[in-house]
Amino acid sequence: MDESSEDTIAAAEKEAGLRFYLTREPMILALLSAIAVVLFVGVGGLSRVYHAQRESLGNRWFARGVEDLKQQRYEQAVGEFRAALRYSRDNYAYQLNLAQALIGLKRTSEAYAYLINLWEREPENGLVNLELARIAAQKKETEQALRYYHNAIYAAWSDNQEVERGNVRLELIEYLLGIKSQAQAQSELIALAASLGDDSSLHQRVADLFLQAQDYEHALAEYRLTLKSDHRNSAALAGAGLAAFELGRYPLAQGYLEAAVAANPKDSQSRDRLKTVELVVQTDPFRRQIPVDQRNRIVIQAFETAGERLKSCSAAGDSRERASPQTLTEMWTKMKPQITERSLRKNPDLMEASMDLVFAIERKSSTLCGPPTGTDMALLLISKLHEGN
């Protein structure tokens, strides 16, 4: 075989080898790619299994913590929420519940650290703002407490948004009453009352708070709304009676208090208040539609009662009275002979003059000798009722 033939054979063999390699290379690449895909999928699957297991463990610890938190087992709850956070360090719900458990243990500084971090992440979260408000209130940081309470009122709530907002406002009102901020409490109560709906129990609670805020007009209105659907509610009847009493509407108060005592005979406060109201109604000579003779007898009795009050007043009161040019005692003694039924019939203006003196005696005596009782109390209330007339 000559040299050219050998070269030809070698070239053919080389070409055949190259063709074999070229045909096998895609197969090799495809195989390697398939292996890579399988490995990637496998690693991804293992990763998902790993994360799913961690999530499951975290949720399991969290569920235990939630149950212990409900049962006020705060120490166990803290441990369980911390265990849950090991599996999901930034979980919002885990951190929030841990903060609540820490609050239960009075560890407010630790709770605050979690809560302020959560607030920075979600400043519109209602529960976070509420817990921050409570902590600020405990620290007597009034401005901060009010800010967080108002944030919570207008914040987002996951469930029953309107109910939660109403509950926060109620808590804010009780806080304001606790710090003697009556005017602010009244404003919040008026805002709350506008959105109560037909829930009579809520109307009654708001009425009670209006009483505490000394807003008797709104209190009476809320008690009336309560009684529309529950007219035998003894607590609402007593509250309405008290509100009407404070407003000086004694005949109205009498009706409510009579009903309150009938509904609850053990209500001694309403019974005592009713006695005072009855005395006011019976002792007021200025009330309408009473016969002249009866009016005159009431004036005579009131004048005698005021005289007895003067006599029984304390020595300190008497000494102060003697310092004035003309004491109430002297005025009473000088007027006494005129206070007869005959004189009162002949001189109608005498009734007003005598009652002005009676009222002056009762006011001064209450200042010098302490709060009055019985008919003296009734006369003092009547004096306030007709003050300026």
Label each region the model flagged.
Residues 54-90, 97-100, 104, 171-178:
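Alpha-helical segment of the N-proximal tetratricopeptide repeat
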Residues 83-86, 116-120, 151-154, 190-194, ...:
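Conserved structural position within tetratricopeptide repeats
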Residues 104-113, 141-147, 174-183, 247-255, ...:
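Alpha-helical linker/edge segments of TPR/alpha-solenoid repeat scaffolds
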